[in-house]
Amino acid sequence: PVVEEKKQSNQKKETQPSPQSEKSDEEYDVAVLGSGPGGYTAAFRAADLGLKVVLIERYTTIGGVCLNVGCIPSKALLHTAKVITDAEDTASHGVSFSQPKIDLDQLRNWKSNKVVKKLTMGLAQMAKQREVKVIEGEGKFASPNQINVKLNDGAKKTIGFKSAIIAAG
């Protein structure tokens, strides 16, 4: 179904249960499976349109592979390599530096706790501001309007929805 843009309102509309085979633990207008760039963008936009949204992610932080272990961490390390190369290149300008000492543990800590963590915490805050419910667990469709989620703590939850977006990479 096509989501039509509604007038901005601070009130979320009431969500009615959708047709399903068993009772859901929670009901949403939109369920998004996967919290990478496509998933969180879709979830945030749906929430901005006034829909009640749940974002289901198997890992403990939103942002997907790109943000957590792929593109962003790799680019952070590449940036450090470029800084070293740029410093070496200044010798032609008459400025030279001693050979850098690389502390891999500190470099990894910077990448994980300064770069990646800052971005994932920003996304979590944006989800909270938009009242997007984030559920940590693995979701599988149980019916056309339900997803069974095995939560990361081992519990199970059934999510009812009107529309779903699969953004699992």
Model-derived features: where do they sit?
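Mobile cofactor-carrier "swinging-arm" domains
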Residues: P1-V3, S35
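Glycine-rich flavin
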Residues: E4-E22, E26-Y28, F44-L51, E57-G169
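Glycine-rich Rossmann-fold phosphate-binding loop(s) that bind the pyrophosphate
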Residues: G34-P37, T60
